């Protein structure tokens, strides 16, 4: 299977909405190359900074690179994405450029490696590519070694970062965790590093399960995390203290009742993948089912909610 890299150069004001459009239409990751970074090169909020190459950035504006597999990226989807982007009020119509290139499946992982470096994803967690060597900066730093494979992001998406922050806050070593839509397995690995002994990772995609298992092996927890194909929580009979789901909003909406029923009393539902336009509906649904919303994070147009199962 081949992949299409859709490259779009746009003005800064349109970046957030354009990124949401690409992700909502199924892009397996969006790379953001901002020309301002060459000028400012600021130290990020966790103290990481890397040397930037001028040739990797547009002369002005921002280049977005989105990745679609050949099974889903057809002429209809191409035109739909273009129409939605061109209809953005924030878009400067005179300074927008579209281009595409095909990336063979065998080159996909190497393409990602050009953009994937160690980075601090939250206060405690640092994501480290499996092909790089990294020395911890502090004893309390928890490193997740990750190889995203061909169809999964690198862990730098706001929804992942927010979930990691929620795990830091609410997950304790004595808890049990079920990770729904595990993808690369990053949130299961984070739970393991917190000290959780009972973890189950589900994904409807068997390739995701395979990628997750390989990442569990890299992090020396392959025998400690149960990774299995599963259709959300529809067939789940066991109870857990924590349900984690970093998936799309409409899928979260389908599983809220099942998440509530899967949790032990007092347990937490940590969920993200929710765009800001849909989070109020998700929050209302969670509250109707019986969740008490105890945390709400916002980052770059995305929302992470934490609901606790409590008795009336």
From Swiss-Prot:
Domain of life: Bacteria
Compartmental location: Cytoplasm
Protein name: Ribosomal protein L11 methyltransferase
Keyword Cytoplasm: yes
Enzyme class name: transferase
Pfam families per record: PrmA
Gene Ontology biological process terms from the UniProt entry: methylation
Family indicated by similarity: Belongs to the methyltransferase superfamily. PrmA family.
Catalytic function, reaction form: L-lysyl-[protein] + 3 S-adenosyl-L-methionine = N(6),N(6),N(6)-trimethyl-L-lysyl-[protein] + 3 S-adenosyl-L-homocysteine + 3 H(+)
Intrachain disulfide bonds: none
Record keywords, A-Z: Cytoplasm, Methyltransferase, S-adenosyl-L-methionine, Transferase
Gene3D superfamilies: Vaccinia Virus protein VP39
Task performed by this protein: Methylates ribosomal protein L11.
One Gene Ontology CC term in the entry: cytoplasm
Taxonomy of the source species: Bacteria, Bacillati, Bacillota, Bacilli, Bacillales
GO MF annotation terms: protein-lysine N-methyltransferase activity
Chain positions recorded as S-adenosyl-L-methionine binding sites: 160, 181, 203, 246
Coiled-coil residue windows: none
EC number: 2.1.1.-
